[in-house]
Amino acid sequence: NSSDEVREWTRSIATMQEIRETEDVNVKIQSKPIDPRPIISQSLSDVILLRGSARKFSRQPITFTQLSNILYSLTTPTHSDFDDKKSMVDIYFIANDVTKMQKGAYFFNRKDNSIDLLKANVQRNVSGYLCLEQSLFSDASVVFYIMTNLGLIVDILGNRGYRSCQFESGIIAGRIYL
């Protein structure tokens, strides 16, 4: 890896961030601010035990505050080659069972810490279907989808630019999981 390649990568990342700043989600139906609140501090071992590693979900709802805390954790910076505030991925989710929240498909707008309802009354089986028809995901209260515009990534960062998206997505998925 030569210094020219590093300079080109840095220019590509800057171009990618400029494009991401100008993108907008035009399918917004309803926007709702998230409501993160401090939660009782737990030890790492307690968090790991409670994180839902079981192959079965209880089909019990989570609260809007719990969902908000998960989403809020996704806004903290990630130390990498690019500014996390100018992410290369978008976060969508299907809310199957969240108290004080309509069932549906949502977009998490990290710029203003809000969620945008994209489609109301999405049935539980849709989240399972989208996860390779695994019923496990129909049972979950919320199912997250981390997406990117792969064509744009490849055009700007080259045919291996997807790796940056995978790296960022892995960190985000880890935060959701815990």
Identify the residue ranges that each predicted region occupies.
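N-terminal amphipathic, basic helical "cap/leader" segment at the start of enzyme domains
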Residues: 1-142
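C-terminal accessory/binding modules appended to enzymatic or scaffolding proteins
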Residues: 41, 46-47, 145-149, 153-156
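Small-aliphatic-rich amphipathic alpha-helix that forms the alpha element of a beta-alpha
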Residues: 70, 91, 144, 150, ...
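Short conserved micro-motifs at the rims of enzyme active sites and ligand-binding pockets
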Residues: 103-105, 155-158
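Short C-terminal domain-edge/linker segments immediately following a structured domain
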Residues: 122-126, 138, 148-149, 174-178
